[in-house]
Amino acid sequence: MNSESIAVIIPCYNEALTIGKVIDDFHRELPQATVYVYDNNSSDDTSRIATEHGATVRFEPRQGKGNVCRQMFRDIDADCYLMVDGDDTYPAEAAKALCEPILNGTADMTVGDRLSNGTYAEENKRAFHGFGNNLVRAMIKWIYGYSFDDVMTGYRAMSRPFVKTFPVLSEGFQIETELSIHAVDHRWRIKDVPIEYRDRPEGSESKLNTVSDGIKVVAMIGTLFKDYRPLKFFTLVALLFAIVGLALGIPIIVEYFQTGLVPRFPTALLAASFMFLCGLSLATGFILDSVAKVEKKQWEVNVYSKYTFGDYRNDNTNAR
């Protein structure tokens, strides 16, 4: 490890049972790092225990992990941001392996992969979490062409340029998915780091609701699909309209050639409407695709200018 600054950032909600051990473990593994705990309206002694164990404690009143991460990214300045949950499910022993590629300039985001070595399948006791992770991985691979080993992990390290140019849109547990999609779409360098996983200790409860938060994650993927890949998104929408329009219209066309009449005029009008919506969706996709490309070019120029002249200039860090 070099002398560059590391911030261990821990979003917390009612983690009094485990937060003390988590802080101690990261102080042991990364003695040069500053540990930040952001208390998100905890009703237990999370903030008091975190303070007693030497963490810098701050408070975020807007409920939700995404809201906490947004504020952490705005508040904290560091060369490497190591984000971890406060539930003691992620090993501090992997911290150096996650931070090293960030600090030596070979990655912009490292991802703590719980799945490759099988420990998540062995330790996780919550139904459908593994299925949900695989579903999200498959969706991201289909849309963006990148295969994450573990897309939902809460243990990852990020560079300063990545953090300071990442627009947090989500409010809750969609943040991990949003981080992953942003990294892929903006071509940041990503490195998977296999880690051991352990389930929450007895008495510690997960804040993640499998069904409602799962729906929010899928909705976030759809929203970012529309924003980042508008041509592909609206082409699929146009295809759906075309299928319905043709299913309604072909029998009417056949009947017209046979009889010279259009007896089901309302159905014909509906079929024509669906075909019009098909064309409109395609046009929308082409227009928004042009807008998205211009925005992406501008984003790249802004990041490049900051690397060259601004906050990210660092002789020890390679440009993207």
Where do the language-model regions lie?
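Hydrophobic helical membrane-anchoring modules
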Residues: 1-2, 170-320
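Cell-envelope/extracellular polymer assembly enzymes that use nucleotide-activated donors
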Residues: 5-7, 34, 178
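Short, well-formed alpha-helical segments that are part of the catalytic scaffolds
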Residues: 14-28
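Donor nucleotide-sugar binding loop of glycosyltransferases
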Residues: 15-18, 42, 65, 91
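A conserved acidic beta->alpha catalytic loop
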Residues: 39-47
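Acceptor/aglycone-binding surface of glycosyltransferases and processive sugar-polymer synthases
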Residues: 61-75, 80, 92-173, 199-215, ...
